[in-house]
Swiss-Prot record:
Task performed by this protein: Catalyzes C14-demethylation of lanosterol which is critical for ergosterol biosynthesis. It transforms lanosterol into 4,4'-dimethyl cholesta-8,14,24-triene-3-beta-ol. Favors C4 dimethylated substrates, the substrate preference order is 24-methylenedihydrolanosterol > 24,25-dihydrolanosterol > lanosterol > obtusifoliol > norlanosterol.
UniProt similarity note: Belongs to the cytochrome P450 family.
Keyword set includes Glycosyltransferase: no
Main localisation: membrane
Topological relation to the membrane, as annotated: Single-pass membrane protein
Name of the coding gene: CYP51
Protein's name in the database: Sterol 14-alpha demethylase
GO cellular component: membrane
Amino acid sequence: MFIEAIVLALTALILYSVYSVKSFNTTRPTDPPVYPVTVPFLGHIVQFGKNPLEFMQRCKRDLKSGVFTISIGGQRVTIVGDPHEHSRFFSPRNEILSPREVYTIMTPVFGEGVAYAAPYPRMREQLNFLAEELTIAKFQNFVPAIQHEVRKFMAENWKEDEGVINLLEDCGAMIINTACQCLFGEDLRKRLNARHFAQLLSKMESSLIPAAVFMPWLLRLPLPQSARCREARAELQKILGEIIVAREKEEASKDNNTSDLLGGLLKAVYRDGTRMSLHEVCGMIVAAMFAGQHTSTITTSWSMLHLMHPKNKKWLDKLHKEIDEFPAQLNYDNVMDEMPFAERCVRESIRRDPPLLMVMRMVKAEVKVGSYVVPKGDIIACSPLLSHHDEEAFPNPRLWDPERDEKVDGAFIGFGAGVHKCIGQKFALLQVKTILATAFREYDFQLLRDEVPDPDYHTMVVGPTLNQCLVKYTRKKKLPS
């Protein structure tokens, strides 16, 4: 009886495997072309994970289409890899192309009822609150604060006249230090210094399972990192709660108008007249830092790595021509209005090696993309990595060329587009450009390998391979006046 049950189960499994492969490979005339599946359940996950750029380019080439469907863990994923069709992905409302289902993995980190785990009208209000705290009016004093933190870090960690550092690690520290200095009040920084905050974020990040986007059942596994995530978030919320109580006492006794990110979110009022809860405030602070920390770290690192490479000396010389004319203490206008080439360097680094491989949505209602109709139930994805390597839009795409312009309007999607365009774009540019200008004015750098590092596609947010980022720094003899 037992053997018969096993045979029956195996037979059912084999039949289902054959059915699933045949079902995926059989399409309607209006469906995007599919890249054939031969391995049931896993689909193309191994090929995609090994080298996503090479695999997606092969699909696009073999299928002769910039819009195509692959299978990842048994889930149909339709990729919009034609820059001409980007608007078809970024324009539809959340109710048609929904981010909630694919970003359920973030709920333990941000919290229930926050961002993608909130109803869409509430999510839009929360993002608007965050956007109001990242306006140009609030940026005016940020540049001196960023420079102060960068110089403080360099003085404490690059103590000798020359030495060897891991640039990716050091950029990560400078990004979190400068973000905390700009966005948090003094009371919050005293209770939650940048190092401690980075540790809490790391614990929360370690709980994420990227494959759960395509295989949601993975989220139900009782993994130990899930418990660590809950503990880290609870600790952060406890610290914020204590600071809020202390601020309320100060405000009762004197005029206290702390204008940091925490203060702004605490004053935010929903349309129904209610204020954000402590749980929601904590989630939005985590979301803001989570969204920016890795992407800005990676962008700063790539920009510096390319600029210090000998083959890019003409670009470094051009950067120096731009930044060396400014006083040692920069201001907002210097950074945002008078450094166009530095911004080109940053954007080209994002273009060549975008931190996010794909931006995804769940198709809730059939949507037309080009001559195809993407069926309900697909995950639809737009890949900055694939689109930024489109030969028509960006000829010779692996060449780092800050003076290139996109040949197809809307091809660059490094900061998103449409209704979900990155609300932290201006802060990120301010932060990265200030770090670049300060570091290259005061130090010379030498990459300790022949070529720029390879992208590490095994991390959730893709940056240069960590062990390839060793760099020699040399303090300049005389700082610019």
